[in-house]
Amino acid sequence: MDVSAALSSDYSSGTPSPVAADADDGSSAYMTVSSAPPKRRAGRTKFKETRHPVFKGVRRRNPGRWVCEVREPHGKQRIWLGTFETAEMAARAHDVAALALRGRAACLNFADSPRRLRVPPIGASHDDIRRAAAEAAEAFRPPPDESNAATEVAAAASGATNSNAEQFASHPYYEVMDDGLDLGMQGYLDMAQGMLIDPPPMAGDPAVGSGEDDNDGEVQLWSY
């Protein structure tokens, strides 16, 4: 009988894993970071500021983001579990992977993880462990807090202000004012251009009618 195939079949069908079954009887307790804190290696400076001060296997990647990875029991290969929004979500993902890889020898962040989380059987593939870790983290996603609600309100208020400004800019009243300013400038331009044009000749001007053809067009204002 193929043991690995049977374990995979049990996990896919939703059958509780042996780890969870043993945890229900309460025969023995798992180690946790509070009862058996992990030893910190000396000389490591790269991750000192990014490692979580309490949770095992959790590091800060960016502001507001936490990453988690675990090491295989008998090897140097690490299993990347993903990036999470909170440190608790990453810590729950770590517990699932640690239980799947080490069983009773796992050091957990939470004592209730074997009871509350769905753990794949020991010997599961890396992909199965990642999927179980993602499900566990999602189950502990916190609800939106007040700060997120305040941010959404501020964004909505900013959008309303921009919309009002656009409505005022497109109002017909402002278009009329712009047209009036244009007409005023055009009037000044017409006046400046008119000063450069000679005035029309007046009646009785000696200069008028000096030509031979001008007599026919002369207008007599007074007749005796």
Curated annotation (Swiss-Prot):
Residues 1-16 have a biased composition (Polar residues). Transcriptional activator that binds specifically to the DNA sequence 5'-[AG]CCGAC-3'. Binding to the C-repeat/DRE element mediates high salinity- and dehydration-inducible transcription. Gene3D superfamilies: AP2/ERF domain. Belongs to the AP2/ERF transcription factor family. ERF subfamily. It is found in: Nucleus. GO terms for molecular function: DNA binding; DNA-binding transcription factor activity. InterPro entries: AP2/ERF_dom (IPR001471), AP2/ERF_dom_sf (IPR036955), DNA-bd_dom_sf (IPR016177), DRE1A-I (IPR045277). The gene is DREB1G. This is Dehydration-responsive element-binding protein 1G. Keywords: Activator, DNA-binding, Nucleus, Stress response, Transcription, Transcription regulation. The keyword DNA-binding applies.
